[in-house]
Structure formats: structure tokens, C-alpha cells
């Protein structure tokens, strides 16, 4: 991830391709691709119990999350490519990008707690909850347990990343199972 850190712009933006010769900063290189700056160090820590990579990337993750927060002050963002591979279904890009904004913010809050950064922990925990609430308020039909239009990605991404309210997880999971 040293290349990630080297390629990050001062404002927090990462390019589409890492390493890059300068290309990929002005495209839709948003959260669904560049969340690697947070997800990889966190999962290395979870798997190995080694926090070195998390420590090394902490300021970069923070700069990245702060950038997204500046461009998405309401907690929702459509910055990114979205789920562009499926031929027949189209997922809402604002839904998937906002979930990854939540993921990165939650990882940052957890890393802050682990590293004893109490003020950061409080701030980013509150921000993560704001994002989670914004996603659920806009995209979750609480009666049906369906996110967005109900396609697989729109159901699976909130489940995978723990956006779904506890009392609705079964319902959302059943809806996903119907799509598979």
C-alpha cells in the first residue's frame, strides 16, 4: 500500500490505477474502487493481528474520508463507478458509493479506537452513523426489506457491510436469496 500512499493527492483523492503516471485522478475513481486504502489495512489487521499497515495508512484513510465528507456533507455520494459490470441489472450508484463511504468511515473510527485516538474515534463513529442513517432513510423500504430496486448488489452490499438495521437483516437476506 506504499504506492497508494504515494499516489494520494493532498486533498485525499486516489487515482483509478495505482501506481499511475498521472492518469486517473479526474475520472469516477470513487469509493467502490479506491476504498482499498482502508479495507486492505483493516483486513490485514483482523487476519494477522498486525496493526503496522493500519498505522502507516491511518493519515491517508483520514484524508480520504475527509475528502468524501467535504463533497458529500449529507452522508450520501454518487462519486464512483458503481456496479458497472452486470448486463441486465443496474444498481443505484449513490447507494453503493454511500455504503463504501460508510465502510471507510467505520474502519477509520475502529482504527482510531485501536490506536488510542479518542477524539477521532468519537468524530468518525458519529459520521459513520450519520452515513448509515442517510443510506437507510433514502434506500431502505422497511416494510419490504428491499434496498433500492432490489437487485442483488443493492441487497448484498448493505448486508455485507452491516448497514442493515439488526431487526431487518433476515428480511433483507431473504430478498437477496430470491434474487440469486
Please provide the spans of the model-predicted regions.
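Active-site core of glycosidic bond-cleaving carbohydrate-active enzymes
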Residues: 1-180
Amino acid at each position: 500500500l506504499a504506492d497508494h500512499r504515494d499516489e494520494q493527492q493532498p486533498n485525499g483523492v486516489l487515482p483509478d490505477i495505482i501506481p499511475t503516471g498521472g492518469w486517473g485522478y479526474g475520472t469516477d475513481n470513487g469509493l467502490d474502487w479506491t476504498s482499498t486504502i482502508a479495507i486492505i489495512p483493516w483486513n490485514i489487521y483482523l487476519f494477522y493481528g498486525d496493526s503496522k499497515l493500519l498505522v502507516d495508512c491511518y493519515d491517508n484513510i483520514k484524508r480520504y474520508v475527509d475528502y468524501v465528507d467535504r463533497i458529500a456533507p449529507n452522508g450520501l455520494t454518487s462519486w464512483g463507478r458503481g456496479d458497472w459490470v452486470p448486463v441486465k441489472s443496474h444498481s443505484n450508484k449513490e447507494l453503493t458509493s454511500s455504503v463504501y463511504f460508510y465502510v471507510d468511515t467505520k474502519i477509520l473510527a475502529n482504527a482510531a479506537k485501536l490506536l488510542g485516538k479518542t477524539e477521532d474515534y468519537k468524530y468518525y463513529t458519529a459520521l459513520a452513523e450519520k452515513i448509515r442513517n442517510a443510506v437507510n432513510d433514502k434506500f431502505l423500504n422497511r416494510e419490504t426489506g428491499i434496498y433500492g430496486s432490489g437487485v442483488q448488489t443493492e441487497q448484498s452490499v448493505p448486508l455485507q457491510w452491516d448497514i442493515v438495521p439488526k431487526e431487518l437483516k433476515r428480511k433483507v437476506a431473504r430478498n437477496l436469496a430470491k434474487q440469486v
